[in-house]
Amino acid sequence: MPTLLTRKLEQTLPPIKSGDNVARVKYFTPWSTWTWYAAEASAELEDGSEVPLSDPRARDRVDVMFWGVVFGHEKEYGYWRLSDLAEIRGPMGLMIERDLYFHSTPLDQCQDPTARHR
């Protein structure tokens, strides 16, 4: 299974609170319609501080915090951690996946995965 966050993807994600509104990574649950579009990300350090993923201190991170839009029960902008995504398990042990074919998309154009079924 592909990794949820590669070094190459890390280089494309601006730090949290940079004001960027372009999703660069898409995560989804293969057993439901939950979908996360990440526009910004920062490394969380052991002392609780956050630094850009491009910062050399990010190598010693304890987690990665994302900001973007989530389509779950409803559309919601907010924050989530990489570790939270990695811990989620669905039926038969299914895990969150990264859309390998996703291209950067403005957040306001990201699609609700259930919209076409309404």
Task: Specify the residue positions occupied by each region the protein language model found.
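Low-complexity, intrinsically disordered/propeptide-like segments
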Residues: 7-8, 12, 16, 48, ...
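Helix-rich interaction surfaces within compact, conserved domain-sized segments
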Residues: 76-118
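Proline-rich intrinsically disordered, low-complexity coils
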Residues: 2, 14-15, 30, 52, ...
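Short linear sequence motifs
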Residues: 20, 59, 94-95
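Acidic, aromatic-enriched beta-alpha/helix-loop junctions
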Residues: 39-91
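N-terminal domain-onset segments
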Residues: 1-31, 117-118
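Amphipathic, interaction-prone secondary-structure segments
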Residues: 18-46, 51-53
